[in-house]
């Protein structure tokens, strides 16, 4: 199953990156850098500074989202990662509506997609996710989607064949001379998995950002410079059961500055 999932993800991901080599297929793209500072993280050192690069695009047959975090532990040392680490996700999706050139809308669903994600952290920390995705038409939202994944990990660590539900959203509220943007996602893993290396527990990560468009307020251009905060609520972080000896329920608000370019 792992090899099949990995091959499917690799092949589809290569197809999903075709816009890099065929500019006429690329409909839009955007990049950003984000700085975060927060305290009271769990499992890892409690103070963290993070620099995040993000890329998003929409192309002829789907869309792609990529982010890479560089995380600094403010001089403290993580037992397995040292004083800093990295983590990233690559998430291409293929639109069946666009590939088949037909409208696949029903109810609140605007389109049906094949959703994939490759997660990669430091060390033997990688996972492949694949499943159906749905773009939803929710009044007032800039976008709203739901991806339903089957997770498989690389190597023998636990976390195989468990289901993950990932909604994502974006909503804009006019505020004075500018706007407040509320966007984010939630990862909800509904199953447990156990191997000789341990147990991966069901977990839920709710991760919205609340951002004020400072660039628009200062007449520097809309959707270029944001300030605000990111909130991370993670129950049973990393799939670690909080009922054990390690506190793994996390609730952290981080100061945020984000620049789009």
Model region roles, listed by residue range:
Residues 17-19:
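N-terminal signal peptide c-region/cleavage motif recognized by signal peptidases
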Residues 22-29, 61-63, 96-113, 137-145, ...:
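Short loop/turn motifs that connect adjacent beta-strands in outer-membrane beta-barrel proteins
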Residues 22-71:
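Short glycine/proline- and aromatic-enriched beta-strand/turn motifs that initiate or cap beta-hairpins
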Residues 35-41, 70-74, 116-122, 148-154, ...:
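Transmembrane beta-strands of outer-membrane beta-barrel pores
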Residues 53, 90, 130-132, 167-169, ...:
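Membrane-embedded beta-strands of outer-membrane beta-barrel proteins
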Residues 153-224, 234-235, 259-261:
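Outer-membrane beta-barrel transmembrane domain signature
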Residues 249-261:
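Outer-membrane beta-barrel "beta-signal"
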């Amino acid at each position: 199953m792992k090899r099949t999932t990995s091959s499917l993800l690799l092949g589809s991901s290569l197809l999903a990156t075709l816009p890099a080599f065929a500019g006429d297929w690329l409909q839009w793209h955007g990049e950003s850098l984000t700085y975060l500072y927060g305290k009271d993280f769990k499992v890892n050192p409690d103070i963290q500074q993070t620099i995040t690069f993000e890329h998003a695009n929409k192309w002829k047959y789907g869309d792609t989202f990529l982010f890479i975090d560089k995380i600094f532990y403010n001089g403290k040392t993580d037992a397995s990662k040292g004083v800093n680490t990295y983590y990233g996700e690559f998430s291409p999706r293929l639109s069946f509506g666009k590939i088949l050139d037909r409208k696949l809308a029903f109810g609140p669903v605007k389109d049906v997609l094949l959703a994939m994600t490759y997660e990669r952290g430091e060390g033997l920390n990688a996972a492949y996710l694949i499943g159906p995705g749905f773009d939803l038409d929710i009044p007032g939202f800039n976008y709203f989607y739901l991806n339903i994944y089957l997770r498989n990990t690389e190597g023998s660590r636990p976390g195989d064949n468990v289901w993950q539900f990932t909604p994502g959203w974006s909503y804009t509220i006019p505020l004075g001379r500018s706007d407040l943007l509320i966007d984010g996602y939630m990862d909800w893993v509904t199953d447990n998995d156990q191997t000789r290396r341990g147990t991966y527990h069901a977990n839920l990560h709710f991760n919205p950002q609340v951002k004020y468009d400072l660039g628009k307020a200062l007449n520097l251009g809309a959707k270029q410079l944001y300030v605000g905060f990111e909130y991370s609520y993670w129950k049973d972080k990393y799939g670690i059961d909080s009922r054990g000896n390690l506190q793994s329920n996390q609730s952290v608000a981080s100061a945020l500055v984000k620049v789009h370019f």
